[in-house]
């Protein structure tokens, strides 16, 4: 018993305990809502490049739980995407639909497809030709965040617009 008490009082044990306690209290950083919020700033990319699209326009939108309805914040991002795609017609796009880990594989694949289709339909309504767009669903197979909390799940409920090079 005395050995345990002497170890507990040693400066090394106290320092180790304090460093573990401080590390356990690390705060979480807020993640960006879309790629345009990555802090790289407007104008950091060559106009018309895929980096320009990702940084200055935003390549992803997010959805509410079990929903494929385009939210108001997503409508703004998609409107900017449509304008950019009309300005640079050499690009075609693939719209990836994603879901969080909750639900069956089949349900999440179907939900991801509905999200990709809703995104495609919105862009088409803003003048992007449908022959320049294709959709694919990854369901819950490609999460960007992995944890058992809504902070992660909400990042995985998304549609990502991927640029394909000219002539594709």
Curated annotation (Swiss-Prot):
PTM per Swiss-Prot/TrEMBL: The N-terminus is blocked.
InterPro entries: Bact_OuterMem_StrucFunc, OMP_bac, OmpA-like, OMPA-like_CS, OmpA-like_sf, Pal, Pal_lipo_C
Lipid-modified residues, S-diacylglycerol cysteine kind: 25
Domain of life assignment: Bacteria
Subcellular location: Cell outer membrane
Lipid attachment in record (N-palmitoyl cysteine): 25
GO process annotations (BP): cell division
Keywords: Cell cycle, Cell division, Cell outer membrane, Lipoprotein, Membrane, Palmitate, Signal
Disulfide bonds: none
Topology term for the membrane: Lipid-anchor
GO annotation, cellular component aspect: cell outer membrane
Entries under SUPFAM superfamilies matching the protein: OmpA-like
Main location: membrane
Any Pfam family: OmpA
UniProt KW Plastid keyword: no
Binding partners and assembly: The Tol-Pal system is composed of five core proteins: the inner membrane proteins TolA, TolQ and TolR, the periplasmic protein TolB and the outer membrane protein Pal. They form a network linking the inner and outer membranes and the peptidoglycan layer.
Database matches in HAMAP family: Pal
Family stated for the protein in its record: Belongs to the Pal lipoprotein family.
Protein name, UniProt field: Peptidoglycan-associated lipoprotein
């Amino acid at each position: 018993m005395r050995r345990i008490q002497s170890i507990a009082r040693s400066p090394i044990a106290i320092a180790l305990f304090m460093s573990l306690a401080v590390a356990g209290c690390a705060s979480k950083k807020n993640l960006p809502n879309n790629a345009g919020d990555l802090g790289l700033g407007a104008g950091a990319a060559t106009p018309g490049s895929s980096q320009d699209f990702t940084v200055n326009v935003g390549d992803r939108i997010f959805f509410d739980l079990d929903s494929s309805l385009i939210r108001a914040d997503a409508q703004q991002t998609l409107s900017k995407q449509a304008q950019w795609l009309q300005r640079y017609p050499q690009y075609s796009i693939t719209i990836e639909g994603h879901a969080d880990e909750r639900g069956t594989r089949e349900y999440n694949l179907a939900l991801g497809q509905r999200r990709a289709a809703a995104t495609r339909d919105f862009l088409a309504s803003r003048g992007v030709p449908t022959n320049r767009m294709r959709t694919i669903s990854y369901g819950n197979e490609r999460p960007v965040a992995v944890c058992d909390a809504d902070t992660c799940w909400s990042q995985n409920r998304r549609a990502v617009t991927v640029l394909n090079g000219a002539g594709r």
